[in-house]
Design a protein with these regions (language model features):
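Alpha-helix initiation/capping motif
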Residues: 1, 38-42, 90
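Alpha-helix C-capping/helix-to-loop hinge sites
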Residues: 11-14, 34, 85
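A beta-strand edge to alpha-helix "cap/lid" segment located at domain peripheries
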Residues: 3, 51-143
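A solvent-exposed, acidic/Ser-Thr-rich amphipathic alpha-helical stretch
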Residues: 21-75
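Short acidic-aromatic low-complexity motifs
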Residues: 2-26
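Proteins with a high burden of low-complexity, intrinsically disordered sequence enriched in S/T/G/P/A and R
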Residues: 15, 35-39, 121-124
Length: 143
C-alpha cells in the first residue's frame, strides 16, 4: 500500500482547481522546490512557493497534470508524468517530466523536477505538440 502517493494526489487535486493553499498544506515551511530542471534557482520556503503558484494560476486556463508511474523508497516518491495545461492566451502545453519528492512527516520538504525546457518554451510560443510528446503522454494514469 502506498504511503506517499496519496499526498501527491492531494497536491494534484488541489492544483487542478488552482487552489494554492490546498497545495501548500502538503509542504513544509522550509520546502525547497526545484521546478526548472536547474535553469533557475530553487524556490525556497512556503511563502516563496505561494508567490510562485499565485503567479502561475492567473495565466493558466485549465490544467491536466497527471502521473503515469511512481515508486516509493522510504521517504522518497519518484514519479513520471506530464504537466499539461492550456494558457489563457490559447496555447496548449504538455511537458513530460520525472521528479522526486522527499517527505518529512508526510509533508514534502524537497521537490525536484526534471524535464526538457525546450518543449515547454516551444509550446508556450505556440508550437504544436509533437507526435513523440503525444505518444509519451498517452498513457494510463497511475492509481
Amino acid at each position: 500500500m502506498s504511503r506517499l502517493y496519496p499526498v501527491l494526489q492531494g497536491i494534484i487535486s488541489a492544483w487542478h482547481n488552482q487552489d494554492v493553499e490546498g497545495v501548500l498544506v502538503h509542504v513544509t515551511d522550509d520546502i525547497v522546490w526545484r521546478n526548472s530542471s536547474g535553469f533557475a534557482p530553487a524556490i525556497r520556503g512556503k511563502a516563496a512557493m505561494r508567490a510562485a503558484l499565485q503567479g502561475m494560476a492567473p495565466v493558466i486556463k485549465t490544467n491536466k497534470w497527471r502521473i503515469f508511474d511512481y515508486a516509493e523508497s522510504q521517504d522518497r516518491l519518484f514519479m513520471e508524468g506530464v504537466d499539461e495545461f492550456w494558457l489563457k492566451t490559447g496555447e496548449h502545453v504538455a511537458i513530460p517530466y520525472a521528479g522526486v519528492l522527499e517527505f518529512r512527516n508526510l509533508l514534502v520538504y524537497q521537490w525536484r523536477e526534471y524535464f526538457d525546457g525546450r518543449i515547454s518554451s516551444s509550446m508556450k510560443a505556440g508550437a504544436p505538440m509533437t507526435d513523440e510528446v503525444q505518444n509519451m503522454i498517452s498513457r494510463p494514469i497511475a492509481k
